[in-house]
């Protein structure tokens, strides 16, 4: 026998094989990331143009109140809880926006001795991990915004634990309630993962953790400073509830070096312009629907013209015409207001599209070879092509309707004037007739008195 054959074990009487199917979920290690950070960029109107030039919005301070009271409490950050004391728009812990006129420096809202950025003391998480944090408060024209960042250093964690960066959903829009909307930027280095898109999906799902009524869905992807970036948006009509998230997964050592303060400034301006464009466009669509309703009500009044014409009584006809004229003029004024609002919205989108384009150009100038920022460019194209064009179409329709109803008002006025002249003429005729009758009666009375006197 061969040597190989001699080494073989003797045959067994019976061999039993048991196949165990191990599920992929057990074989595959759960996704993990390194050094994750979350940055909140909220955008909240400081001014209310409807209340007058440079008028402060009624709830302008609510952004700072929510960051201090809600987020500060959830993260147990004393610095964040005392945020009011660090802002120049507060005096004795009370909101005092007038102080911005004297103390505002390039839009920076933190008091000078706090520095440009307020560092938060290390926050101890339930698992005893340390969490760093900082906040940078800014006013961009008529809007309050901030860069509130929380991050882990030298930590590898399961993606499923990302909700630790969002306790009780305190960083989501339904908690922050920013009037113009917000963007959340989640940055991390992949550790254990399948694919980048799948990892990004899992990060969003874990971070939101069913705390958002309408979950943000994947919208686009690109590459920034050599690393893939994914965009998610819930696209709710209410800006204060709309959840916009960017997931940036480090795939290049140059990424962090390129994400400078200069880049962050341009990114904040770009996201602010984006939020304003989305907010104003949604508002413009609402105004247009209201204007359409007014136009519909005006169209329902047109058949009444013919009905009034059939009225036999001149006085009743005149009263009905005057009433109809008053109703049409009131609705025309309301329609004209909506047109003016739409024109203002169009101008606002124009201005912010220009600001967005400028910020995007600046970011592109900082980008590295291989970057792909088409998803940012597509939003600009959407604003310039769809949003602005839609408002132009709406305005043309409403202005054409305005012209039609203006002609109707002119016709009504003419009818009222004619009927008024006819009625006045008739009344003069009746007055003269009555006067003549009275003269005849007076003459007859004089004759009677004369004859009676003569007879006596």
Residue ranges: model-predicted function:
Residues 5-7:
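Low-complexity, intrinsically disordered or signal/transmembrane-proximal segments
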Residues 314, 320-456:
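Membrane-associated alpha-helical segments
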């Amino acid at each position: 026998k061969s040597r190989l054959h001699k080494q073989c074990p003797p045959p067994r009487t019976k061999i039993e094989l048991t196949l165990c199917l191990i599920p992929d979920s057990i074989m595959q290690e759960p996704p993990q990331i390194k050094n994750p950070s979350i940055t909140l960029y909220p955008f909240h109107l400081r001014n209310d143009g409807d209340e007058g030039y440079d008028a402060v919005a009624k709830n302008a301070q609510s952004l700072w109140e929510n960051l201090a009271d809600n987020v500060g409490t959830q993260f147990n950050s004393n610095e964040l809880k005392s945020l009011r004391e660090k802002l120049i728009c507060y005096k004795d812990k009370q909101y005092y926006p007038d102080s911005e006129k004297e103390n505002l420096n390039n839009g920076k809202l933190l008091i000078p001795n706090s520095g440009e950025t307020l560092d938060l003391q290390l926050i101890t998480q339930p698992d005893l991990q340390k969490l760093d944090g900082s906040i940078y408060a800014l006013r961009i024209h008529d809007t309050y915004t901030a860069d509130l960042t929380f991050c882990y250093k030298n930590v590898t964690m399961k993606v499923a634990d990302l909700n630790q960066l969002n306790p009780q959903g305190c960083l989501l829009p339904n908690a922050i309630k920013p009037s113009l909307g917000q963007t959340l930027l989640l940055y991390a280095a992949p550790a254990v993962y399948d694919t980048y898109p799948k990892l990004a999906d899992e990060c969003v799902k874990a971070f939101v953790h069913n705390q958002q009524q309408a979950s943000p869905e994947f919208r686009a992807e690109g590459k920034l400073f050599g690393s893939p970036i994914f965009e998610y948006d819930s696209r709710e009509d209410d800006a204060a509830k709309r959840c916009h998230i960017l997931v940036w997964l480090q795939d290049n050592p140059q990424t962090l070096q390129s994400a400078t303060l200069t880049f962050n400034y341009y990114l904040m301006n770009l996201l602010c312009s984006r939020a304003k464009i989305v907010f104003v466009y949604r508002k413009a669509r609402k105004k247009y629907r209201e204007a359409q309703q007014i136009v519909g009500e005006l169209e329902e009044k047109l058949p009444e013209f013919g009905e009034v014409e059939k009225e036999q009584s001149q006085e009743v006809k005149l009263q009905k015409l005057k009433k109809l004229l008053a109703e049409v003029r009131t609705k025309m004024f309301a329609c004209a207001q909506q047109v003016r609002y739409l024109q203002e919205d169009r101008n606002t989108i124009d201005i912010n599209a220009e600001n967005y384009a400028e910020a995007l150009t600046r970011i592109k100038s900082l980008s590295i070879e291989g970057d792909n920022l088409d998803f940012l460019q597509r939003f600009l194209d959407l604003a310039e092509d769809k949003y602005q064009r839609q408002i132009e179409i709406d305005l043309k329709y409403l202005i054409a309707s305005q012209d039609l109803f203006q002609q109707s008002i002119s016709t009504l006025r003419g009818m009222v004037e004619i009927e008024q002249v006819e009625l006045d003429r008739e009344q003069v005729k009746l007055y003269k007739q009555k006067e003549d009758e009275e003269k005849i009666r007076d003459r007859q009375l004089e004759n009677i008195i004369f004859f009676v006197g003569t007879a006596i």
